[in-house]
Amino acid sequence: MLWIGAVVAVLVAGVLFSYVVEALRRKPTAPTRLAWWPAAPIETVEVDGVRLRYVAAGEGPTLVLLHTLRTQLDMFQRIAPVLAARFRVFALDLPGHGWSDIPEARYDADYFVDVVSKALERLRIRDAVIIGESIGGSIALLLAARHQRSVRAVVAINPYDYAGGQGIRRSSLWANLVFGLTNVPVLGSTVNRLRSLPVVTLILRGGVRRRDALPAGLAREIHLVGNRPGHARAIGALVRHWSTWESARTEYAAIERPVLLLYGDHDWSLDHERAANAHDIPGAELRVISNAGHFLSLDAPDEVLAELVPWLGKLDSAGGSNQATALAHSA
């Protein structure tokens, strides 16, 4: 039985060591501007006492960009500036992510949809095309399902609403290990505290297909953000409530807005999971981009734009409003 005591001692030592590592991490300082988009000033909007970072630039019909789990608005750096040449583009850091506040919250699907809805109201955004990637795409679909006045149409890029929320574990061995341990009591939080830049980089690489897809410095930025007090707790809470994204799919049948489902052929979702969304969302169009993975706006930005802009133009021919006409003309 001595080996049992030895194992327990090692585990306890590992837990204690993780707390020391976390305490010694240097707390990062928020950037005052985006190196990749200096023309877009960094601003904040407050929702229920929680400050959310966002940027806005461009003139024209409104687009809102929503990122995914454990990332931030910088995920759109390859499409946001291009879109801003034709549209008014907003990109938002979700609560507990990026440089937004990290509140004590449930971090489930309802929470994110509620916060984003209120943020759009505070920003007086109406009739916008909501473009979300992964969980951001799921948020966009749920906003439309709940008939939010802010939603004109939705582009859901690789929406994350399958496999009980465990889809990321399909991306790589490292992601399977790290996120597989997250829900294990004590061990999961210990792994979170021992996070490192190489592991963050490997997990991000599991979401792209092309070798040059990840911009220089992005992994480091996302890793540094993870050193903010409370960040690991927030991500742990989100992972514990992953299943709520798939459960919320029951609301898709209520969507009455135009929807474009855009997938990479190497997304973590399976063919039948994509087909289920196309079936369950009335009138949804499904497109698949070749040789591209989950973080599609980074992996295949030109192809995303090539699918997106013509689709916006089709909104008017399908009986859309004057807003759709403006979208088509601006494209």
Where are these regions (language model features)?
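Short N-terminal helix/helix-N-cap motif within the alpha/beta-hydrolase-1
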Residues: 71-81, 99-102, 165, 247, ...
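Alpha/beta-hydrolase fold catalytic core
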Residues: 1-61, 86, 125-126, 313-331
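Active-site loop/oxyanion-hole signature of alpha/beta-hydrolase fold enzymes
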Residues: 55, 91-131, 306
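Conserved hydrolase catalytic core segment
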Residues: 126-169
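Catalytic active-site module of serine/aspartate enzymes centered on a nucleophile-bearing elbow/loop
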Residues: 282-331
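Conserved HGGG/HGGXW glycine-rich cap/lid loop of the alpha/beta-hydrolase fold
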Residues: 50, 55-99
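Conserved loop-alpha-helix segment in the C-terminal half of the alpha/beta-hydrolase fold
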Residues: 258-292
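Conserved alpha/beta-hydrolase catalytic His-Asp/Glu region
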Residues: 24-26, 166-170, 189-253
